[in-house]
Structures are given as structure tokens and as C-alpha cells.
A protein has these predicted regions:
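Short linear motifs embedded in intrinsically disordered, proline/glycine-rich low-complexity segments
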Residues: 1-191
């Protein structure tokens, strides 16, 4: 196993001791392949978090060595994560894998995600229709503080799904209050 990959797994092993995560991966192209539709991450691990599935990407950070394209040694490289309520499902749904991959593609092409950044995607493909998800807010993963990794500082950004009404509230200036409420309440960090 490679140093960066092992490091990400170790971060989550602290949260889920003894678990072997499920892994989902799309066919990938080499990182220098800039064609549209190319997978931006090498896969997504899924952990059983009790009442939720906890997804984390693998590949936005340097997994094998420090690439020329990565941020400098003082920057923070981040993987994306998402906690999705189980909704009585015995197996984790795949729509979060696709959603995280889509957002990872934007990040790998230069989009910036940081604490309290929200964005509208339109209806999220595959998500339960009754959830009404149309976007997300980015938070620093509360359970995993950024720390030195093998190729620089590594953090995890938690994406929390938002409804159209929540996104409208944010657009109308209610972002600080809503995002603070989500950040302060682990139950509201489930999508």
C-alpha cells in the first residue's frame, strides 16, 4: 500500500477501529489525462458509522508521491467526505460516490472548497427524491483535524447535503446562522 493511501485509511481507522471499508471506484485515467469525464479520484471508501454511511474520497491528496500539481508543503490537501443516513439500507447507496466524484472533478480543475462554502448543483442524481437535495455546504470534518501527512498537511472536508430552501436561505444572507447550526450539531451533518 502507498503512503498517502495508508495515511487516509489511518485517519478513518481512528474513527472506525477494526473496520475494513467497502470500496467503490470508477475506471480511472492517468492524472495528466484532462479529458472531460475522467475520474478525479481513485475511489471512495465507505465506513459503517452506525446510523449513517461515511464516505471518503481517495485521490485529491497525493497518494503515491508529492506531485508537481499539488499545493506546496505549507498548504492543506483535502479529501472529501459525506455522511449519509442509512434509511434502513443494508448496503451503502452509490449516489454519494458519484456526487463526491463530481465535486472532486471540480476541485481538481481549480474550484476551491473551504469551511462554510455552499454551492447549488441542482437535484442530486440518485439521492432520495423526498430529501430534496440540491447542493451542499463544505465544513472541515469535525472528527478529523488537519495533520501532517507523508506529502504535506492533510485534511478532510465534510460535504453536507442541502435542500433548495436551505440554499435559498443562504443566498438571502442567512448563511452564517444556518451553517453555524449545522456545524454545531452532528445530527444535522447527516445527508
Amino acid at each position: 500500500m502507498h503512503a498517502g493511501w495508508t495515511f487516509i485509511e489511518a485517519l478513518f481507522a481512528d474513527l472506525y477501529p477494526g473496520q475494513t471499508p467497502k470500496h467503490a471506484a470508477a475506471a480511472i485515467a492517468p492524472q495528466h489525462d484532462l479529458r472531460l469525464g475522467r475520474a478525479s479520484v481513485e475511489g471512495t471508501h465507505v465506513y459503517d458509522a452506525g446510523n449513517a454511511w461515511h464516505y471518503v474520497t481517495l485521490g485529491l491528496t497525493d497518494l503515491y508521491d508529492q506531485s508537481d500539481a499539488s499545493v506546496g508543503p505549507n498548504g492543506i490537501r483535502c479529501e472529501l467526505s459525506m455522511r449519509v443516513a442509512k434509511r434502513d439500507s443494508a448496503e451503502p447507496p452509490l449516489w454519494p460516490v458519484a456526487f463526491l466524484g463530481k465535486i472532486a472533478a471540480h476541485v481538481s480543475q481549480g474550484s476551491v472548497l473551504a469551511q462554510a462554502v455552499s454551492f447549488r448543483t441542482g437535484p442530486i442524481a440518485g439521492a432520495p427524491a423526498d430529501a430534496g437535495l440540491e447542493g451542499a455546504v463544505a465544513l472541515l470534518e469535525p472528527a478529523i483535524a488537519p495533520r501532517p501527512g507523508p506529502f504535506g498537511k492533510v485534511g478532510v472536508i465534510l460535504l453536507v447535503g442541502l435542500t433548495g430552501l436551505q440554499l435559498d436561505e443562504i443566498k438571502q444572507g442567512g448563511s452564517a446562522k444556518l451553517i453555524a447550526e449545522i456545524a454545531a450539531d452532528p445530527a444535522r451533518q447527516l445527508t
